[in-house]
């Protein structure tokens, strides 16, 4: 369901936009989310006059669980557009159509809330291992069994592996189901930059109930792992040379595809954006065989060499939560894309307490990606 808010009030530097959304009864028996991107400024989200969230980052897409705030019938979903309290660290976002790709969606109360996936070489380098973790959720108030599973097809279309598992989840909570099957023949389908058509495996995540499939989630992943060995960047045990180009997605997918192809034709194999990009940007890089060093929306060159507490935004403890929030948002959005080989904590920014805490967090959650600043 599209979310296309219109202005309805203004006060000082703030503008209120909103839309009255008709929520059908069937949605009230599920879990409802609002996806927001291309807002262009900081905002406060309210639903039926209840505050849901305050967001200072104008560039990174975000999702919000609205189930506690909505009801059957008409619902007023509003955004108060305002100046960011963290303007000092914002990169300048690309100009895109306001509120493009904002929408609401629903899932059943027994569904897939999140996942992590990678197809990497095993310890012998002879085969691949699918490292898959599915976070299943139970939106009911009581224990419920939830069955989740997957299948994986080779780039040539052959079914390679299929499995599912049932787990009983307490009410209003989640549980993680892990699968680690060997995938044979992967060395014939290496995902590497420079290839004309880099091979991608097709994976389908699903939930099942009473013998019927209830939810499908199609994915594409490439085989490989980028590692730092003795100070050398390697992939498939060969030293990797990155030819980098700074680039942010254009206003639309078609233009971005043409520009990425042009960058690749010039010999570039690594794209370095200034802040998190639209979801389809990473899809294009997966398909084209371009590495991406993703970047959090942190750009704080102000007094970057000042080592005093508060001397630079990166060493101002009052901003530590905002730094962490932005690094987390970057990581969770793009971590499952084969093209993403590293995460940058930000653009031109000084060092300090906030950067250190962000680095610590990123290191604690990801061992398959490199970290940069």
Regions found by a protein language model. Give the residues of each.
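Secreted/periplasmic carbohydrate-active enzymes, especially glycoside hydrolases
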Residues: 1-279, 283-287, 341-342, 361
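Short hydrophobic/aromatic-enriched beta-strand-loop microsegments
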Residues: 55, 290-296
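Alpha-helical scaffolding within the catalytic cores
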Residues: 228-231, 279, 314, 322-331
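Generic structural signal for well-ordered alpha-helices
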Residues: 260, 282, 327-331, 355-359
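Active-site cleft segment of glycoside hydrolase catalytic domains centered on the general acid/base Glu
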Residues: 313-317, 345-363
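Active-site groove signature of glycoside hydrolases
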Residues: 326-351
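Conserved small/polar residues in nucleotide/adenosyl-binding loops
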Residues: 368-373
């Amino acid at each position: 369901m599209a979310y296309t808010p219109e202005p309805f009030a203004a006060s000082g530097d703030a503008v209120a936009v909103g839309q009255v959304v008709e929520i059908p009864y069937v949605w009230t028996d599920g879990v409802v989310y609002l996806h927001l991107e291309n807002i262009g400024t900081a905002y406060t989200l309210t639903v039926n006059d209840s505050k849901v969230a305050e967001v200072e980052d104008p560039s990174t897409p975000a999702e919000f669980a609205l189930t506690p705030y909505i009801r059957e019938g008409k619902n007023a979903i509003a955004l108060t557009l305002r100046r960011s309290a963290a303007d000092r660290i914002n990169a300048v976002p690309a100009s895109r159509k306001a509120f493009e790709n904002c929408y609401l969606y629903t899932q059943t109360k027994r569904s897939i809330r999140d996942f992590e996936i990678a197809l990497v070489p095993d310890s012998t380098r002879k085969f691949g291992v699918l490292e898959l973790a599915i976070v299943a959720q139970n939106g009911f108030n009581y224990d419920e069994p939830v069955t989740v599973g997957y299948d994986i097809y080779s780039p040539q279309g052959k079914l390679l592996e299929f499995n599912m598992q049932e787990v009983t989840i307490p009410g209003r909570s989640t549980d993680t189901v892990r699968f680690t099957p060997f995938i044979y023949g992967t060395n014939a389908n290496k995902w590497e930059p420079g290839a004309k058509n880099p091979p991608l495996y097709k994976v389908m995540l699903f939930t099942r109930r009473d013998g019927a499939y209830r939810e499908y989630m199609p994915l594409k992943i490439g085989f490989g792992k980028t590692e730092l060995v003795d100070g050398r960047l390697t992939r498939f045990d060969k030293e990797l040379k990155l030819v980098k180009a700074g680039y942010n997605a254009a206003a639309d997918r078609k233009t971005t595809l043409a520009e990425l192809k042009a960058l690749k034709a010039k010999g570039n194999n690594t794209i370095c954006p200034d802040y998190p990009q639209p979801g389809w940007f990473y899809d294009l890089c997966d398909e084209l065989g371009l590495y991406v060093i993703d970047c959090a929306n942190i750009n704080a060159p102000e007094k970057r060499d000042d080592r005093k507490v508060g001397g630079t935004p990166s060493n101002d403890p009052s901003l530590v939560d905002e730094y962490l929030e932005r690094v987390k948002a970057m990581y969770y959005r793009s971590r499952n894309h084969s093209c993403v080989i590293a995460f940058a904590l930000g653009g031109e920014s000084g060092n300090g307490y906030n950067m250190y805490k962000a680095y610590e967090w990123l290191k604690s959650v990801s061992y398959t990606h490199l970290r940069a600043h």
